[in-house]
Amino acid sequence: MTAPNPPRRRDALANREAMLRAAQSVLASNPTASLDAIAQAAGLTRRAVYGHFADRDTLRREVIAAGAQRFNAIAETTDESDPRVTLARMATRLWREASAVRASANIALDDAHLTDTVLALAPLRHRIRDLTRTGVDSGAFRGDMPAELLAFLIEETARATLRELRLTTADADSTVVRVVLSIVGLSWREQAELISAHPEIFAQD
């Protein structure tokens, strides 16, 4: 029979999770935030931070890894019969992880972490490329450009939109979905029809 984790171990795990959440939130708005700022946001001491992370770069790599794990899981588990619905649903679910998206994107602006970010997000990028190819081949997505280029435009547009701090209204997820659908060739009327016919696009997980 496995013994339960002792209180100190549980506290250490809770502190680590608190630090990662705080780092994600702080770095989403301030990519140059210090360890002191992150520790303060987590309600912990600087010493507690160093007890889990050797330095600021180590913590930033952990933030990238934690975010990528969620993003890649979303990519792998979002699969509808209509590629337009799949893309819209994926955009909705990623928007709900906007803080993690912004933190990872901000960290990636630092060349020292660009390679880490690219590698961590490779599964998500591959999923978008495969989905785009399916959408183009089926006629669901625009066919006036190579699928590889369209996938790149989807990725870059989604990243820019998800990082937009001014999207704070209750229907911000709808805005994100409409922006992405417009990139793949849907008119605003077609977007409205698709959203109306597929309420699952905005369903909670």
Where are these regions (language model features)?
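C-terminal peripheral helix-coil segments that are non-catalytic and often amphipathic
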Residues: T2-A3, D130-S138, R163, L167-D205
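Amphipathic alpha-helical packing segments from all-alpha helical-bundle domains
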Residues: R89, A112-R163
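Hydrophobic alpha-helical connector segments
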Residues: E62, A73-V101, H113-T115
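Short linear capping/connector segments at secondary-structure termini
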Residues: N106-T115, S196-A197
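Basic, helix-initiating cap at the start of DNA-binding domains
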Residues: M1-A41, T58-R61
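Short hydrophobic/aromatic patch on the recognition helix
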Residues: G43-F53
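Alpha-helical DNA-contacting segments of helix-turn-helix folds
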Residues: F53, D57-G67
